[in-house]
Curated annotation (Swiss-Prot):
TPR repeats (start-end): 51-84, 89-124, 126-158, 444-478, 532-565, 590-623
Gene3D superfamilies: Phosphatidylinositol 3-kinase Catalytic Subunit, Chain A, domain 1, Tetratricopeptide repeat domain
UniProt entry tagged with the keyword Repeat: yes
Protein's gene: PHOX4
Name the UniProt record assigns to this protein: Protein PHOX4
SUPFAM superfamilies associated with the record: CAD & PB1 domains, TPR-like
Length: 782
């Protein structure tokens, strides 16, 4: 990339205060200049050193994507450096890069920084490449083509310039533009040297002064006056003498066959002051000329309303806030901007929005939608009363976006941006207004031609629209009659019941997931110490208890959704049963008695589990009785759908499958209930409660209803912990024989082909191994 070249500055020796140029006066002036220059050089070294530190700090912030902080560091460095320093162009280009990273809306500011960089170093290729990228993004392809070509003239191997040049060239060719002719104009163009332009300006000034002296007062009055301001002095805040007025001089340069503006600014010598009592009108000032080759920036303030004048001048802008939820962005708009311009600026600031409404908050606090320019000006009139002007953006479907002053919703954003770019290039408001008028005439012509064509061929599209509207109206009326009828209410009730059952079933399955997670294995190394084992077991106990609580919560929510959902009641009963066993085995680590808190918690869980089992069993038996009598809710639904010929929506099992499934359901519920009572009898016996034998008797009854054999029941009773002939430990493992019964039923079911049902996964779920681990750890030898 090109390295910025520093400008050589020849400091002039200041004149003696007395105005003398000879002998001793010259000597004293020379001595004063040397001492002042030495102090100036020492201070400047400090400033330059600090500026370099700020430059490095800005580079680090840029790498961290803190673009605003980086620009602040670069700006501070620029204020410390002399204007002819070699790093000025680099800092300006770095600020342009920061603006480019902040979005398309900041590209005009990036172009401005590139222009300032090229003012400091006209052959700095990085600034040209950055500016070319900005022009390409803003659809100013001719300017992008020019800058890329200039860089390639200086550096044929510049990769970035080659990429931009090829892309822009391809787009221009697709648009039918003669790129070869443009390339011929730019092939030998080099950046204009600042020294050469300075010489041209001085020559023009000398000629204009001669014309003033010879032309007299009349010619002087006719010539236009301009006030020349030194931007460098204004930025540093130093005192400046009054600027002289001079004739407006233009420098015509041809780059690629196109004319560009060249702005000339003059800076007066700071070391010279006016004499208050002198007879002369004023001493002649020395002028340092600067020539800046700057392209017009594409900013929203350049686009003014159609009624504005065609004269070029500074457009008064207003700063507004664009509020989209929590995203608030600044924007600059002219005072007389139109609602279409505001729409385009919002699309540029929020490119992800496909459709939106523009709103403002009135004096009553309501958000009012803006659709016309008059409404926009009304919103601006509340600016003084309510503080800063805020425009609120509400995202909507593109079909719901309103038309803005005659513009259709389907107008392409690319076309709008091209129109704005073309307007900024031409700089003429009149042409923009003329294009709107031409567009209106063109639309009227299409409308008139369409009317003639329809009359000529006898084609009437309105009749089709009328037929469609009539058909939709009749269809809506018919649907309204069907929806409000008595039969529809019954169908709605069927649909509501099915959705209710579906929601409850989803919560049931959600709870089953947590029950499965509670069976997480405990990994204990073989050589682990007892302390490590207890620590691992305690962590597993906390995990399992949390999962049990989550499962119970989901089962209870399912019951709230569908109160007669017996599956959720049975699942809740099993969860409370397993939770009670977990708490009992965990309580064995300390001395267990009836008065302890752990014992009371275990008995409370057993009571809840029994209540849930009883309620679930009762609801299921009532539903089975209604089904057998033909008065169930499902039978009513089938009859209703059969009348409407929609009975195929329900799949019905055969009578044999229904009988087998009912028998299996009863067996599984009684088996689970018997296991619960058997385990409770063991707990009550250990706690010394006299009701343990009653629980054992009821458990035996439940096992008999479940279809267990007399031999298996006798083995269970014999191995109860209350029996003298029972095995050592906590008693017979009821879970093992229940699992054996389930496996026997599985084999039978596969032979008969009986379909499974919702609770079967719950009944098949094995007890967590954590129960055995807790029993072995806390009841074993210490």
């Amino acid at each position: 990339m090109g390295k910025p070249t520093a400008k050589k500055k020849n400091p002039e020796t200041p004149k003696d205060a007395s105005g003398g140029g000879g002998g001793g006066g010259g000597k004293s002036g020379k001595t004063y200049h040397r001492s002042t220059s030495r102090v100036f050089d020492e201070d400047m070294e400090i400033f330059i050193s600090r500026a370099l530190e700020l430059k490095e700090e800005g580079n680090k912030l840029f790498q961290k994507r803190d673009h605003e902080g980086a620009m602040l560091s670069f700006d501070k460095a620029l204020k410390l450096l002399p204007k002819d320093h070699i790093d000025v162009a680099y800092l300006r280009t770095s600020m342009a890069s920061c603006y480019m990273q902040m979005g398309l809306g900041e590209y005009p500011n990036a172009i401005s920084e590139c222009n300032l960089a090229l003012e400091a170093s006209p052959r700095y290729s990085k600034a040209l490449v950055r500016r070319s990228r900005c022009y390409e993004a803003l659809n100013k392809l001719d300017y992008a083509f020019r800058d890329a070509r200039i860089v390639l003239n200086m550096e044929p191997g510049n990769v970035s310039a080659n990429e931009i040049f090829d892309r822009v060239k391809k787009v221009l060719v697709d648009k039918g533009i003669d790129v070869d002719e443009m390339e011929k104009d730019f092939v030998d163009v080099q950046p204009v040297c600042a020294a050469r332009l300075k010489k041209i300006v001085k020559e023009r000034l000398r000629k204009s002064k001669k014309k003033k002296k010879s032309g007299g007062k009349d010619e002087e009055l006719k010539s236009p006056k301009v006030v020349v301001v030194d931007k460098g002095d204004e930025a540093e805040g130093r005192n400046k003498p009054k600027e002289e007025k001079s004739d407006k001089s233009d420098i015509d340069g041809k780059i690629g066959g196109k004319r560009e503006e060249k702005k000339t600014s003059f800076k007066s010598d700071k070391g010279q002051k006016k004499k208050s009592g002198g007879n002369k009108a004023g001493e002649e000032r020395k002028v340092e000329d600067k020539v800046v080759v700057m392209d017009k920036e594409v900013i929203a303030s350049e686009i003014v309303d159609g009624g504005g004048s065609k004269k070029e001048g500074a457009t008064v802008t207003r700063t507004i806030k664009l509020v989209h939820g929590d995203d608030i962005r600044w924007a600059q708009l002219p005072l007389d901007s139109t609602v279409r311009l505001v729409r385009d600026v919002i699309r540029d600031r929020f490119p992800a929005l496909r459709g939106f409404l523009i709103k403002y908050r009135d004096t009553e606090g309501d958000l009012v939608t803006i659709t016309t320019t008059d409404e926009l000006r009304l919103a601006a009139s509340t600016h003084d009363k309510l503080g800063s002007l805020r425009l609120y953006i509400a995202e909507v479907n593109p079909d719901q976006e309103p038309t803005y002053d005659g513009m259709s919703n389907t107008e392409s954003t690319d076309k709008v941006s091209k129109r704005l770019s073309s307007l900024a290039d031409n700089g003429s408001v009149g042409e923009y207004v003329g294009s709107d008028k031409a567009s209106g005439c063109f639309e009227n012509w299409i409308f008139q031609f369409a009317q003639l064509f329809k009359n000529h061929v006898g084609f009437d599209s309105d009749s089709y629209v009328d037929l469609h509207d009539l058909g939709m109206k009749l269809y809506t009326e018919a649907m309204e009659d069907a929806v409000t009828g008595e039969d529809a209410q019954e169908l709605f009730q069927i649909a509501a019941d099915k959705f209710q059952e579906m929601g409850a079933l989803a919560l049931l399955n959600w709870g089953n997931v947590h029950m499965s997670k509670a069976r997480k294995q405990v990994c204990i190394p073989e050589d682990a110490s007892r302390e490590a084992i207890i620590e691992a077991v305690e962590a597993a106990f906390v995990w399992t208890q949390n999962e049990y609580n989550k499962a119970a919560e989901k089962y209870e929510e399912a019951i709230k959704v569908k109160p007669d959902f017996y599956e959720a009641l049975l699942a809740l009963g099993q969860e409370q049963f397993e939770h009670a066993k977990l708490c009992w085995y965990h309580a064995l680590k300390s001395k267990v008695d009836l008065e302890s808190e752990a014992s009371q918690e275990v008995l409370k869980l057993y009571n809840k589990a029994e209540d849930s089992m009883e309620r679930g069993m009762q609801i299921w038996e009532e539903m089975e009785e209604c089904r057998l009598n033909g008065i169930s809710k499902l039978d009513k639904h089938k009859n209703m759908l059969r009348k409407l010929e929609l009975d195929e929506l329900f799949s019905e099992a055969s009578e044999e499958e229904t009988v087998e499934q009912t028998a299996n359901m009863s067996s599984q519920i009684n088996l689970l209930w018997g296991s619960l009572l058997y385990e409770r009898s063991i707990v009550e016996y250990k706690l010394g409660l006299p009701t343990w034998d009653e629980c054992l008797e009821v458990a035996v009854e439940k096992f008999e209803l479940a279809g267990a054999s007399a031999t298996d029941i006798a083995v269970m009773v014999k191995n109860h912990c209350s029996s003298e002939s029972a095995l050592e430990g906590m008693g017979f493992k009821i879970d093992e024989i229940v699992q054996a019964w389930n496996e026997m039923y599985d084999a039978k079911r596969w032979q008969m082909g009986v379909p499974s049902f919702r609770l079967e996964p719950m009944f098949r779920r094995r007890a967590p191994k954590l129960h055995d681990i807790l029993e072995n750890v806390f009841s074993g030898p210490v």
